[in-house]
């Protein structure tokens, strides 16, 4: 009997559109797709002949704007039946809580969630897929879909990049999605597999491990496309000259009139400059003292690394205060801003002032050398960032606030309860990093991953399919899609082989 594959495809994961094409040629089966896409690509996706889908759905077409006949009993039963904490996801949805164009009411949020849950159940009941193929979720709605599939026993083959960018992995259950075993501190499938894994080679020295990390830290190949100021301006002109009907059809674009978008952009430019000026004046770029330091690395606000993975730690200024309260008296806390926060116009000045006015805190400029800061510190703390892994390579213990794909390493302590933070910090400060633990993690990742740069393949997709446009609501063409397939065939071959191996295992 043929296997059934359901793919979740959005504008940033068109590699799954290509994957479906190549998998059909390799192993056959029935293929279905849910598209989370804007209006203009729909015509191509409905009419295309490149990939044979037995049936497709467009997510946004099943979420109506004026649906207010709420069925809270259904939502309550859905939550109980599948053990999915809906408000935990909805209350941290960035489109709901960080939206500068539209204020969603409680009833609107519940209405959207109800329609999503009913739509997902209907699709799964209709086709009964054996596998779901998707990227790691980044919003409440694809996380609900992911968790629903897992709860119903459907194998979700989720593609994600590892902490070594040129390698990717296909996992059937991510450790950081706050399932019941995570919430109750039970061991995840990943942790159990890691414990059972045995090292097959001699442990490298710290010097050799650091060399490995540097060689596997940045992308091994580049892309010949990048956005120029001229291209940015042309994109803006293209946006203002096109139809904007999507704001009435897709809830994620509610309130985004061209007038509002234009003035929001102007406001963001001035806001970013004011905040940047404040940072330049108040944040240190270099630490000359030789005191005892603990380093906390801020995450970018409104990103899934905090909103989904660490739902109860999104107020990072409060996290800083809790760390300060828990430090041994001889330590000072260094707090480094994330360089990518500038893409979101930095944080509010009053947040920075609150940080600066906190006792025993030194604010560190985003351009400061992170490696040097780690070397000066006795412990490195973050919500979930990859820099904690870097710290281990530099022989510094780490402390993380949520489950990650590296938090099972013994030299990384995880916060189980905030009231235990003081003890956890003291325990972490006593850790002497063991190179054998790093070696095991490297070998474990290499064993469970394959050579494929997900980020670079995405950049190639943006270049060929979108023609380099910064807009997502543009028309697709068979010519552009074929160019993407042909120009990146080697990458699709790697991806297809990995999925065939996973499905066959």
Region spans (language model):
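Nucleotide-activated donor-dependent transferases that construct or modify glycoconjugates
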Residues: 1-13, 35-37, 105, 133, ...
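Histidine-anchored nucleotide/phosphate-binding helix
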Residues: 9-27, 146, 312-327
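Conserved N-terminal ligand/cofactor-binding loop architecture of enzyme catalytic domains
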Residues: 22-120, 161-273, 493-494, 498-504
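Conserved nucleotide-sugar donor-interacting segment of glycosyltransferase catalytic cores
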Residues: 118-181
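A donor-sugar binding/catalytic signature common to diverse glycosyltransferases
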Residues: 135, 160, 366-413
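C-terminal amphipathic helix plus adjacent low-complexity
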Residues: 191-249, 279-283, 418-505
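Active-site donor-nucleotide binding/catalytic segment of nucleotide-sugar enzymes
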Residues: 288-317, 322-324, 337-341
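Catalytic donor nucleotide-activated moiety binding site of glycosyltransferases and closely related
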Residues: 321-364
């Amino acid at each position: 009997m043929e296997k059934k594959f359901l793919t979740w495809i959005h504008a940033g994961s068109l590699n799954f559109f290509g994957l479906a094409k190549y998998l059909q040629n390799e192993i056959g089966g029935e293929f279905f797709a849910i598209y989370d896409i804007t209006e203009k690509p729909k015509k191509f996706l409905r009419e295309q002949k490149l990939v044979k889908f037995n049936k497709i759905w467009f997510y946004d077409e099943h979420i109506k704007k004026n649906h207010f006949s709420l069925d809270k009993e259904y939502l309550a039963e859905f939550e109980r039946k599948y053990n999915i904490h809906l408000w935990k996801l909805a209350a941290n949805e960035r489109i709901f809580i960080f939206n500068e164009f539209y204020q969603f009411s409680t009833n609107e949020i519940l209405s959207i969630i109800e329609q999503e849950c009913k739509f997902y159940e209907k699709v799964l009941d209709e086709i009964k897929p054996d596998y779901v193929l998707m990227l790691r979720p980044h919003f409440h709605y694809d996380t609900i879909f992911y968790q629903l599939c897992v709860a119903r026993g459907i194998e979700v083959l989720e593609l994600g990049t590892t902490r070594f960018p040129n390698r990717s992995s296909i996992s059937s259950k991510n450790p950081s999605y706050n399932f019941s075993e995570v919430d109750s501190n039970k061991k995840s499938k990943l942790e159990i597999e890691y414990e059972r894994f045995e090292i097959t080679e001699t442990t490298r020295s710290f010097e050799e491990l650091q060399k490995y990390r540097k060689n596997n830290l940045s992308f091994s190949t580049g892309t010949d496309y990048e956005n120029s100021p001229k291209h940015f301006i042309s994109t803006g002109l293209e946006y203002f000259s096109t139809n904007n009907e999507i704001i009435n059809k897709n809830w994620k674009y509610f309130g985004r009139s061209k007038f509002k978008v234009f003035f929001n952009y102007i406001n963001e430019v001035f806001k970013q400059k004011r905040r940047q000026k404040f940072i330049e004046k108040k944040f240190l770029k270099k630490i000359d003292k030789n005191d005892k330091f603990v380093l906390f690395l801020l995450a970018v606000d409104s990103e899934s690394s905090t909103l989904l993975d660490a739902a109860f730690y999104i107020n990072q200024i409060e996290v800083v205060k809790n760390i300060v309260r828990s430090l041994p008296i001889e330590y000072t806390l260094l707090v480094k801003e994330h360089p990518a926060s500038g893409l979101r116009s930095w944080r509010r000045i009053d947040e920075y002032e609150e940080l600066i006015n906190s006792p025993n805190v030194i604010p560190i400029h985003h351009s400061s050398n992170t490696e040097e800061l780690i070397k000066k510190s006795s412990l490195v703390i973050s919500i979930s960032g990859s820099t904690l892994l870097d710290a281990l390579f530099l022989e510094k213990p780490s402390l993380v606030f949520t489950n990650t794909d590296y938090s099972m390493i013994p030299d990384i302590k995880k916060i189980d309860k905030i009231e235990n933070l003081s003890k956890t910090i003291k325990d972490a400060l006593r850790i002497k990093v063991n190179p054998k633990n790093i070696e095991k993690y490297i070998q474990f990742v290499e064993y469970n991953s394959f050579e494929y740069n997900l980020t670079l393949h995405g950049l190639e997709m943006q270049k060929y399919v979108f023609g380099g446009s910064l807009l997502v609501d543009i028309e697709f063409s068979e010519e552009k899609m074929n160019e993407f397939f042909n120009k990146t065939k080697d990458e699709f071959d790697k991806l297809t082989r990995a999925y065939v191996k996973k499905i066959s295992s």
